[in-house]
Amino acid sequence: MPCVPNCFEVPFLEDLDDFIMLSVNQIKFLRSLRERKYRLREQAFAVEGPKLVGEMLPFYRCRMLVGTAAMLRAVSTPHDAEVVELPESFDFKRISTQTSPQPLMAVFDLPAEPEPVVEGLTLLLDGVQDPGNVGTILRTADWFGIRHVWLGTGSADVFSPKVVQASMGALARVQPPPLKNTVDTLAYFRRQGIPVYGAFLEGQSLYEAPLPNFTEPAILVLGSEGRGISPEVAAEITDRLTIPASGLSVKGHTESLNVAIAAAILCSEWRRRS
């Protein structure tokens, strides 16, 4: 993770006679970070709201803080960050992705991509494209103390605004390296003797299958919303798990669970066994 910058409070902002307004280029820059290609080009991503900004500040290098005086006072700011104080009258929707934005935005440097490691239960998202689902899975992982969530090919960018918002600060604690080759990565860890579990519609019941302790190395693969786990990734899985539907319904049941809900059920049962 990035180094932690020194922080200090910014009481001097309330004494400024004039507000520093955003330039046209600054507005274009902030809006451009909504798209992945510009995040990669600028090596930066944006976070909105005092809660999320406050959670991310100790873990990512802050490049820029933009907000009203009240919002800026709610957080500490790194000494080397550019600070732009806006008047209450500024229409924050000009730079925000939110319908009802809180007038605070931070721009952070993208972190160096960590190497994939397995420490306890590790999640792998195979083509999970929906940003809301990816963010919710990161939040679920954080809740259960899972520190490693890998992003397989085709998964949503974790630094997109929707994923950042849905993760509710989990990116401060969960490391999500994108995998250059999902199959090769799984094959490598399989050779190290690490079991690879996968969530399928058909498999051994989660509630009957033997599971390793939560702290023991294991990989759990979650497939995309539409097609599930891809065939090439499925070939590397050692244990197939399924969440059985309730037998109480006599007229059938819904075809499948949302991937984020399935992740929460799987992680909860894994933790309960430990």
Regions found by a protein language model. Give the residues of each.
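RNA substrate-binding interface of SAM-dependent RNA methyltransferases
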Residues: 112-206
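Active-site/ligand-binding-proximal alpha/beta "capping" segment
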Residues: 198-254
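Arg/Lys-rich RNA-binding interfaces used to dock onto structured RNA substrates
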Residues: 7-131, 271
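Structured adenosyl-cofactor binding patch, chiefly the S-adenosyl-L-methionine
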Residues: 106, 143, 158, 163-170, ...
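Short beta->alpha connector loops at strand-helix junctions that form conserved
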Residues: 86-88, 126, 152-153, 175, ...
